[in-house]
Amino acid sequence: MTTDTPVPTWTWPEERLQTIMNRARAGRSFKPSAWENGAKCAVGLSFDSDHDTFELRDGGKSISALSQGQFGPRQGIPRIRELLRNNSIPATFFVPAVSAIHYPDEQRALIDEGHEIALHGWIHERNTLLDGDTERDLQHRSADALETITGIRPVGIRTPSWDFSDNTLQITAEMGLLYDSSLMADVDCYELLLNGEPTGVTELPVEWIRDDAAYLVMDRWGGLRPQIAPHDILQIFIREFDAAYEEGGIFQLTMHPDIIGHRSRIWILKELIGHIRQHKDIWFATHADIARYSKLNG
């Protein structure tokens, strides 16, 4: 007689623990002693342009949920572009292929304004639910789609929902991508190891603390309700930046056009940029430029 009861983790042998822990792990730090043009701190602003795909990825067809995603390209992106343009700040937009295909002019306009377009899955799928061949196919197709639309081959990836499978790092390394921005082992860039071996892929780490969705997502049917006022979120982001500045490191921020792009919320980013601009020795850069500089100078 067989049973599907999982083996208790406290009975796992050390070899199994090491295999799991070392599949994708942080290697050596790539923190440079100084940044481009002698800047003390690098600032990388990023936006995940999920748009309609957040509803579509699991087969959802809710017109209400789709309309919420469509707020991103209709209202959020224009507000973000204007704010970045007024402050001469380059940023990185992680774009699911389906979003890029349905909003191609948006991607071309962002490229024309000096921003980076990077990988964010095909339809914001969860990688841990895919077999390796499917994940590999979708990642290659996504890169091809973004290149066709923008004319530039993406060099970086952020996995949808930061969902990182056992196959993700190997596929990313096989594709020769410069960086990933989905993991959280540090505040500075570091090299990613696959089964203990260097991959050549640089990690530009993220954190839920520095993600607008962690504070502002509303789930109509679930228990998620925004409980933090915009002013308080701003103070968290300012404290994160101030610490990064004192350490001479990176201030990385993850945002979403359909979240931060609302009128009462874009204020957070506007005020944050104003605070950062009070410091003269700042390098605003795309994630690709930060990862590349860190790898060469760290």
Residue ranges and their predicted role:
Residues 224, 228, 232:
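A short glycine-/small-residue-rich loop at the edge of a beta-strand within enzyme catalytic domains
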Residues 2-156, 161-209, 231-253, 261-298:
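Catalytic alpha-helical scaffold of carbohydrate-active enzymes acting on polysaccharides/glycoconjugates
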Residues 203-224:
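Glycine-rich, positively charged active-site loop/lid region within alpha/beta enzyme cores that binds
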